[in-house]
Structures are given as structure tokens and as C-alpha cells.
């Protein structure tokens, strides 16, 4: 399936998200489910490894799969790398969802800057550690609406 890249304006997520083209523009190639999943995982891993701020253990260990390795340290590194990539993917998807639901922040640099200012304030509040990126962005959005 052809995809285009949409850059997210979130200071935490420097990178681009793959967004499927509308069905009228592209026709997906039929693949068995397992092949689609493997391809998606490979793309996610490649994208994760290419980040400029990848944790040092991920940068050293380019293999994110947990193959039968003799060294337990390499297994732990592969597992922590997989966790990092999964968290990155979830965070990126949540931010993309928020900006799809609230496109006004994509259209106006001023609105985006106000959102990021409120976003930082929400992050600094006690009890905000357990909030997801989506919940934090939504809280910042609601504060802006209340002003």
C-alpha cells in the first residue's frame, strides 16, 4: 500500500508518521495477514532505529528481534529496544490521533505554539506522569478552550 508522510508538530515527536492514502488514490495489494504484519513490524523497527534520539542500547543493537542468542545481555537489549519502539509507536499514534481530531493546530503556527505552552504546563503538574500523550494534549486543548 502506498503511504505518504505527515510530519507531526509535537516537540517530543521529531519525525514523520505514515498515513495511508485515501482508498480512491491507491489500491492496496492483497497480501496474506502474516505478511502484512511482518511488513508493518519491519517498517516500524526501521523507523524506530532511524530516530536521531534512539537510546544507546538500541543504536548498538540493530537487531530488535529476540533470536536465540548466546549472550543474555543481547537478549535484554533486544527486549528493551522492542519496548522502546513499541512505546514510540503508541506515542506517535496518539499524537497523530489528537491532531486529526483537532486540525486547527496543524493550520496555525500560533495555535500550535499556544497548545505546546499549555502542554508543557500540564506535564509539569503533579499527577500528570500517568497521562498518555493524547490525554496530555487533550488537557492542554481544554485549557485553551476555557480561556
From Swiss-Prot:
- One short Pfam family name for this protein? InvH
Report whether Signal shows up as a keyword of the record.
yes
Q: What happens when the gene is disrupted?
A: Mutant shows decreased levels of InvG/SctC. Deletion of the gene reduces the invasion efficiency of the bacterium to 70-80% as compared to wild-type in vitro. SctG/invH-ssaV double mutant shows reduced secretion of Sip effector proteins (SipA, SipB, SipC and SipD).
Keywords per UniProt = Cell outer membrane, Lipoprotein, Membrane, Palmitate, Signal, Virulence
**InterPro entries, per the entry:** InvH
Lipidated positions for S-diacylglycerol cysteine? 16
Record carries keyword Lipoprotein: yes
Per the record, its GO cellular-component terms are:
cell outer membrane
Family of this protein: Belongs to the InvH family.
Function of the protein: Involved in the synthesis of the type III secretion system (T3SS), also called injectisome, which is used to inject bacterial effector proteins into eukaryotic host cells. Pilot protein that is required for the proper localization of the secretin InvG/SctC in the outer membrane. Required for the secretion of the Sip virulence factors.
Query: What is the recorded name of this protein?
Result: SPI-1 type 3 secretion system pilotin
Organism, as annotated: Salmonella typhimurium (strain LT2 / SGSC1412 / ATCC 700720)
Amino acid at each position: 500500500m502506498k503511504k505518504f508522510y505527515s510530519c507531526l508538530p509535537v516537540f517530543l515527536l521529531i519525525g514523520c508518521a505514515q498515513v495511508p492514502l485515501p482508498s480512491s488514490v491507491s489500491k492496496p495489494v492483497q497480501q496474506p495477514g502474516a505478511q502484512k504484519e511482518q511488513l508493518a513490524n519491519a517498517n516500524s523497527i526501521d523507523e524506530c532505529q532511524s530516530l536521531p534520539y534512539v537510546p544507546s542500547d538500541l543504536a548498538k543493537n540493530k537487531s530488535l528481534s529476540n533470536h536465540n542468542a548466546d549472550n543474555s545481555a543481547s537478549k535484554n537489549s533486544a527486549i528493551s529496544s522492542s519496548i522502546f519502539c513499541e512505546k514510540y509507536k503508541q506515542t506517535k499514534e496518539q499524537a497523530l490521533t489528537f491532531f486529526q481530531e483537532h486540525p486547527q493546530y496543524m493550520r496555525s503556527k500560533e495555535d500550535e505554539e499556544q497548545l505546546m505552552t499549555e502542554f508543557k504546563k500540564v506535564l509539569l503538574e503533579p499527577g500528570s506522569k500517568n497521562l498518555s500523550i493524547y490525554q496530555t494534549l487533550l488537557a492542554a486543548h481544554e485549557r485553551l478552550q476555557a480561556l
